[in-house]
Amino acid sequence: IACAPRFSLCNSDKECCKGLRCQSRIANMWPTFCSQ
């Protein structure tokens, strides 16, 4: 399974590529992106 690269929309950390986390620009708000 291909991982989601940086800045990709995501639902959980496990979707993101290694070293990236699924988080929003504003805490606990949508949308959430894979980011460092």
Curated annotation (Swiss-Prot):
GO (cellular component) term, any one: extracellular region
Domain of life: Eukaryota
Disulfide bonds: 3-17, 10-22, 16-34
Domain notes: The presence of a 'disulfide through disulfide knot' structurally defines this protein as a knottin.
Classification lineage: Eukaryota, Metazoa, Ecdysozoa, Arthropoda, Chelicerata
The name this protein goes by in its record: U17-ctenitoxin-Pn1a
Main location per the UniProt record: secreted
Subcellular location as annotated: Secreted
